[in-house]
């Protein structure tokens, strides 16, 4: 919808204004419809909107980190925790990051969504309840405790 296209433009404009480098995309697709080009951007300033708000669009922001602890600290410092995506060939890092990143889901070496039969939901300020699996149904139910003496 037009609000998401406007939001994507705001994210990119803000990032570029704050010194980020636009590598690919960064605009409405052919100025028609409500499609945003897949966008790749690097050198994101920590004060940029895309570091404090959920993007929900085809923007991939690339970051450089000083070491492993810096990666975990920055990932977990965000107010949101819907999903996290990790790409590494190291099985040790795969396991360690999956455990240490605070998010509703962590995908390793894939950008595909979670499996539909497995409950999935965000944490922190991301998402409401769960989707997928029996826990998704439970999130729409209210339990009632009745005591009769």
Task: Tell me what each language-model feature is.
Residues 1-9:
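Short beta-strand to alpha-helix junction loop
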Residues 12:
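Acidic-enriched catalytic cores of C-N bond-cleaving enzymes acting on peptides and small amides
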Residues 19-28:
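Short secondary-structure junctions
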Residues 28, 35-149:
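Conserved C-terminal structural/oligomerization subdomain of aldehyde/semialdehyde dehydrogenase
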């Amino acid at each position: 919808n037009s609000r998401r296209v406007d939001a994507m433009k705001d994210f990119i404009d803000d990032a570029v204004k704050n010194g980020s480098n636009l590598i690919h995309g960064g605009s409405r697709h052919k100025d028609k419809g409500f499609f945003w080009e897949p966008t790749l951007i690097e050198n994101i300033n920590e004060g940029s909107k895309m570091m404090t708000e959920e993007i929900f669009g085809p923007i991939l922001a690339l970051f450089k980190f000083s070491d492993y602890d810096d990666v975990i600290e920055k990932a977990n410092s965000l107010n949101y925790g819907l999903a996290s995506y990790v790409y590494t060939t190291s099985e040790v890092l795969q396991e360690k990051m999956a455990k240490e990143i605070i998010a509703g889901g962590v995908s390793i070496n894939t950008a595909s969504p979670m499996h539909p039969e497995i409950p999935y939901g965000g944490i922190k300020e991301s998402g409401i309840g769960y989707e997928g699996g029996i826990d998704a149904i439970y999130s729409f139910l209210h339990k009632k405790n009745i005591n009769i003496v």
